């Protein structure tokens, strides 16, 4: 677990024939809470009978058990046969690039305007919560700050909507 603090990208290798263990989820949760980039590699893929079904199952279990890991890439490989092993390094480099990405304030503000127009923040005490602007405070991990008139009153569900939208769009 200490190695996670020193890592920039963590590759969590899972066995395709095993269910998500509690320990796997604990490690993934720790990686995310430490602000590290996470990539999930599912090994022994050559032994899987129904690949599409099993991969869908991995995505569903990850989404259910660890909603903050939404959008984490999952690659399948077989160390024994060498299948898809050449995709591992490019996937690591790609996720590192995303983790290291800087987005301009202007781009973020245009994005915020679109998101708040399509799905406005809720009212609080009869007053509309106005999201004034957004900026990227730091990268590694990408950290964003939204300024508003009632920032303490913004519901967690709306914050999650913004976070998930950021992940999808950038």
Where are these regions (language model features)?
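C-terminal-of-GTPase-core extension/linker across diverse P-loop GTPases
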Residues: 1-12, 17-170
């Amino acid at each position: 677990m200490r190695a996670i603090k020193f890592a920039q990208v963590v590759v969590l290798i899972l066995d395709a024939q095993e269910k998500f263990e509690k320990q796997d989820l604990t490690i993934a949760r720790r990686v995310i809470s430490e602000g590290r980039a996470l990539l999930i590699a599912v090994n022994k893929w050559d032994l899987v009978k129904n690949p599409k079904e099993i991969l869908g199952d991995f995505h569903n279990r990850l989404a259910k058990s660890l909603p903050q890991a939404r959008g984490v890439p999952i690659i399948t490989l077989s160390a024994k046969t060498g299948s898809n092993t050449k995709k591992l390094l490019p996937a690591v480099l790609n996720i590192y690039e995303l983790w290291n990405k800087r987005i301009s304030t202007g781009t973020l503000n245009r994005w915020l305007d679109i998101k708040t127009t399509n799905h406005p923040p809720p009212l609080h005490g009869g007053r509309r919560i106005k999201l004034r602007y957004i900026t990227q405070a730091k990268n590694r991990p990408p950290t964003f700050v939204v300024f508003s008139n009632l920032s303490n009153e913004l519901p967690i569900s709306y914050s999650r909507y913004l976070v998930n939208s950021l992940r999808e769009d950038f």
